A protein has these predicted regions:
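Canonical Radical SAM [4Fe-4S] cluster-binding loop centered on the CxxxCxxC motif
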Residues: 1-5, 166-173
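Conserved glycine-rich "GG(E/T)P / GGGxP" loop and the immediately following alpha-helix
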Residues: 1-139, 144-147
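Short, acidic, Ser/Thr-enriched surface-loop or helix-capping motifs
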Residues: 158-159
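Secretory pathway export signals and precursors
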Residues: 145, 163, 207-210
């Protein structure tokens, strides 16, 4: 399922009330380009929050020149394509970017595959410990990391049903801070549960679930790491 237009509008409207100027990323547990209203969502976000950067992370499976143009015409500032299929896929999207005269600022290819001699297919984190039984097995941490994590201090994840998750790596949806359908976003962001989680993680305490089995390096902040 995908987020409703009404819920998306509610978030954008509430962010506008606090003059939000940060980053908005369309990504998540499903491919955002499969949502038929994605262009409408991007356009509303850019109109309502003109000083924000609107980005998307896609696997590229349904992308073509026509859809790329429509995304940028809708207001998308930057597209990141996660490549899992190897160098041929990388070449395909490199040529597409050249054909459309897209700059590195607007169009980024992220190689998620390993070198051919290793040939395991992709590189991943363990997504909050959820990949233990996945095809590309990356086990949960046997001993929790004693390392700071700043992710919940500067980002959050809104699920299609309104749940606000503390972290986008929480694929098991184990740490839900609130629900935007029932509450205002700022109340969720500043709630006691949110503050307690940030205080723990900012002090290298990963005792929270699923942080206690997560292998994500949470002190890497910036475009290369979100």
């Amino acid at each position: 399922e995908f987020i409703s237009y009404e819920l998306h509008k509610k978030l954008c409207d509430e962010l506008s009330e606090v003059n939000y100027k940060g980053l908005i990323i369309y990504s998540g547990f499903v491919e955002p380009m499969l949502d038929k209203k994605i262009y409408k969502l991007v356009n509303y976000a850019k109109i309502k929050l003109p000083n924000s950067r609107v980005e998307m992370i896609s696997n590229g499976d349904v992308l073509n020149e026509k859809r790329l143009k429509k995304l940028y015409d809708s207001g998308l500032d930057r597209l990141q394509i996660s490549l899992y299929d190897g160098v041929d896929q990388h070449y395909k999207f490199t040529e597409l970017g050249k054909k459309m005269n897209l700059t590195n600022e607007k169009y980024v290819l992220r190689a998620r595959y390993l070198p051919e001699e290793q040939n395991f297919g992709i590189t991943l984190s363990n997504r909050g410990g959820m990949l233990e039984n996945a095809e590309y097995k990356i086990s949960p941490m046997k001993k929790k990391l004693e390392k700071k994590c700043f992710y919940p201090s500067y980002k959050f994840f809104l699920d299609y049903n309104g749940d606000v998750l503390m972290c986008s790596h929480d694929w098991g949806k184990k740490n839900i801070l609130g629900n935007l359908k029932k509450e205002k976003f700022l109340d969720i962001w500043l709630c006691q549960k949110s503050e307690e989680a940030r205080n723990k993680l900012n002090n290298s305490d990963r005792s929270l679930n699923p942080c206690n089995v997560c292998d994500v390096t949470g002190d890497l902040i910036g475009r290369k790491h979100h």
